[in-house]
Amino acid sequence: MTKNNYKKPFVIAEIGCNHKGDIEIAKELIKVAKIFCNADAVKFQKRNNKELLTEQQYNQPHPNPANAYGETYGLHREYLEFDINQHAELKAYCEEMGIIYSTSVWDLTSAKEISSLHPLFIKIPSACNNNVEMLIWLCQNYKGEIHVSTGMTTKSEI
């Protein structure tokens, strides 16, 4: 990406966890983003749920059981997570399709794992933009761009 050289909007297709934990659905969403939406990039999410959630949060029931993929909120989140090898497969598929791969990282472990894939950029969700340990690690170790969302952040927190 080039900065301050505006020619057209840079479109990022937010896939998030809409793949329902199925890598083939994820690949189909990449294809749709590229072919039908002409997106420049796709973005997934990566969480280490045991690191991100408290034990109580992990073990509580999903707030909407009809939409749950597991007995607890933690198991639901685990079902939706791709491991690092699956993320590498998705990145390779993106390269094959001619679209940029990226991921939002929600914790330090996920930041370390995803940065090992050397994506062009990593996004920090607004819910995690005060995770100082993760931000310092990324600034010191990750060579790509870091995009920080501030949607859930007050001016004083920024």
State each model region's role.
Residues 28-47, 117-118:
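Catalytic domains of carbohydrate-active enzymes, especially glycoside hydrolases
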Residues 22-23, 83-87, 110, 124-143, ...:
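Active-site-adjacent beta->alpha loops and helix N-cap segments on the catalytic face
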Residues 16-18, 45-49, 106-108, 127, ...:
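Active-site beta-loop-alpha junctions enriched in small/polar residues
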